[in-house]
Structures are given as structure tokens and as C-alpha cells.
A protein has these predicted regions:
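Loop/turn elements at helix/coil->beta-strand transitions in domains of secreted/extracellular proteins
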Residues: 55-60, 85-91, 145-152, 187-194, ...
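Low-complexity, acidic Ser/Thr/Pro-rich repeat tracts that form intrinsically disordered stalk/linker regions
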Residues: 35-54
Length: 349
């Protein structure tokens, strides 16, 4: 059975994906990405190769709060790797969505963890009595070094998208809670806006949503009304361009009216969550002979969103900086069978 999979795995720490504003444009260096909600399973990715962006272009990378644990990837690594010079935006993932409200995802990683001097962006250790520690304080320091860099707090993801259905029942209350959290005086200077990663409106991901086609538009409209025109409001969305698929399930054109852009999740179309196959490239740019599922490509997703009325200027193409694989495959060409997931650095497949 085919269903666009939003894995718990994508390595979201910085440059895990990059996006571009047009399908035919250069894929690296023109825009930024998207994600999932539990610890990732792919290896740390290299930063985008391009060092400059076109005028108005965006290079958006994800930094995941859980990366500071087993991956040992910290905000400092964004600076020491040189990635901070190549990015225009960072999506900080994830905040939780529960009880119809935005909520902290991991208080220890977010704002409690004390950093030593050698772990800190600026080489200055945290003190026991300072108001803010953790990733938030490190992001604040990173922004001081890179004043044009924007940080957006992303809520939801694969694991925490089940809370959006309740939020959709009272969009104004949801937006109020998100604003109060993002603009908390302790870290209001860290974030430049909010991103919602709902997987998926009126469709199934880890859980199934039945909020209806208009629910996403209701949430984005409420968020824009509350955050105003000076904050960024974005959303990570499905790339399922199949007939009757996830793009068809919601009013993405209507929701786009309130958003600065969409991070279209044009990756993980195929993978070893289907352990026996069909085997296929996980992130095809275009369709090809023998593709196991029509509509599972970047080209199909962008075309369907444009046909629905989403402006091309509001779509960023997602690129996963990792590979996926199977073991025991029966053929080189796509569409073969397998015996299971290939070994991986953090997770099989």
C-alpha cells in the first residue's frame, strides 16, 4: 500500500534539506526545507554547496532539539561548519501541539541545558543564574554573529501532528497560545516567526485527521491575524501529488494566502518503511518509467499545488541530504522487491 511517508527519521539538524522557489531552478542555494517529529535516523548532512543565494532566495535548514543528545549536534556546529554563512533561515524543530495549543517540546534542550565554553557558539559558558540557557540561548548568540539570519519555531512534525485536529476547532485560541509561547519575554528576540508542520490536514499520517478541507486555512488565517505582518508564518506540507492524494484533501491555495511560504516536503516518497519494497529512489525530481506510484515526485507535487492556486513564489522545494536503502533487492530498476531495510547509521533503511 502506498502512502507518502513522513518518517520519524529525517536528520533535521541544519541543512538536512534545502529548498528552491521554482521546480526548474537550481536546487541548492535558493531556498529552504522541512521535517518530522521524533529523533531522526539519518546521518548529519553537509551544508548546501552554494555560498550565495539569488535575490530574494532562501536557504532554510532544520535544527532539531533532539540532536543535542545522541547525535551530539549543537547550535555551535552550525557556526563551526560554516553553515551559518550559507543559510537565510533556520527552522527550530519541534514544538508540541497538544490540547489545542502550542507547547514546549523539550524544556531541557530548549532552554535549560547549560553549555560549557567549548560547547557554546561564542566560547562563553552559561552560568547557573542566567535567565536563558539551552538551544534558545545558543540561537540568540548565533543571531548576534549573523544579524540577517532568521529563526522560525516549527510546531508539530510527524509525532505531534495529532494535536492539530483539536487546534482546528478553535483557531483563534490556538493562535493566541502559539503567539504567547513564541513571544515569551525570555526568548522573544530569538524567533522571527512560526512554522506549522501538520502531517496531514484532513488526511492520514501517524494519526488520521478528519477536520475537513478548510481546517488548514482556518489555522493559518488565525496565526497571521495574531502574529501580524512583521512575523514570518510558514507551513511544511505534503508532496503527495497522486490523484486523490493528500494535496487534494485540503485547501492549500486558501491557506497560502496567509503564509509567507510553504516548505513542500518533496522527499521520502519511497523507503524501507515498506520493508519488502517496492524499491525506488526516495526523492525523485520527476516521474520516470516504472515509478511505483504516479504523483510521487517533486514535479507532480509542485504542478498539483500550482493547479490548485498556490503561487510558485510561495513554494520551497525540499531536498533530503541523505540516502535510503533496502537489502536483498531483486533488481536494479525501480519497482523491485526486497527482504528488508539496509543497515543505517542511526536506523535501518
Amino acid at each position: 500500500m502506498f502512502g507518502l511517508h513522513r518518517p520519524r527519521a529525517r536528520f533535521r539538524a541544519l541543512a538536512a534539506a534545502a529548498c528552491t522557489t521554482a521546480l526548474g531552478a537550481t536546487l541548492l542555494g535558493v531556498a529552504g526545507t522541512a521535517s518530522a517529529g521524533t529523533p531522526p535516523t539519518t546521518t548529519r548532512a553537509a551544508a548546501p554547496a552554494a555560498t550565495t543565494t539569488a535575490a530574494g532566495g532562501k536557504v532554510v535548514g532544520y535544527f532539531t532539539n533532539w540532536g543535542v543528545y545522541g547525535r551530539n549536534y549543537h547550535v555551535r556546529n552550525i557556526e563551526t561548519s560554516g553553515s551559518a554563512d550559507k543559510l537565510t533561515h533556520i527552522n527550530y524543530a519541534f514544538g508540541n501541539v497538544t490540547g489545542g495549543k502550542c507547547a514546549i517540546g523539550d524544556s531541557y534542550a530548549d532552554y535549560e541545558k547549560a553549555y560549557t565554553a567549548d560547547q557554546s557558539v561564542d566560547g562563553v559558558a552559561d552560568t547557573w543564574d542566567q535567565d536563558l540557557r539551552g538551544n534558545f540561548n545558543q540561537l540568540r548568540k548565533l543571531k548576534k554573529l549573523h544579524p540577517d539570519l532568521k529563526v522560525i519555531w516549527s510546531f508539530g512534525g510527524w509525532t505531534w501532528s495529532g494535536g492539530f485536529g483539536e487546534a482546528a476547532k478553535n483557531p483563534a485560541a490556538f493562535a493566541e497560545s502559539c503567539y504567547n509561547l513564541v513571544e515569551d519575554p525570555r526568548w522573544a528576540d530569538v524567533f522571527d516567526g512560526i512554522d506549522i508542520d501538520w502531517e496531514y490536514p484532513n488526511a492520514c499520517g501517524l494519526t488520521c485527521d478528519t477536520s475537513g478541507p478548510a481546517a488548514l486555512k482556518g489555522l493559518t488565517s488565525a496565526l497571521r491575524s495574531k502574529f501580524g505582518g512583521n512575523s514570518l508564518v510558514t507551513a511544511a506540507i505534503t508532496a503527495d501529488g497522486s490523484d486523490g492524494g493528500k494535496i487534494d484533501a485540503a485547501d492549500y491555495a486558501g491557506a497560502a494566502q496567509s503564509l509567507d511560504w510553504y516548505n513542500v516536503m518533496t522527499y521520502d516518497f519511497f523507503g524501507a518503511w515498506d520493508a519488502k519494497g517496492p524499491t525506488a529512489p526516495h526523492s525523485p525530481l520527476t516521474s520516470y518509467a516504472g515509478i511505483p506510484k504516479e504523483g510521487f515526485s517533486s514535479e507532480a507535487a509542485i504542478a498539483k499545488l500550482k493547479a490548485q492556486g498556490v503561487p510558485a513564489s510561495k513554494m520551497l522545494l525540499g531536498i533530503g541530504f541523505y540516502g535510503r536503502g533496502w537489502t536483498g533487492v531483486t533488481q536494479d530498476a525501480p519497482g523491485g522487491t526486497a527482504t528488508g531495510a539496509a543497515p543505517g547509521t542511526y536506523e535501518a533503511g
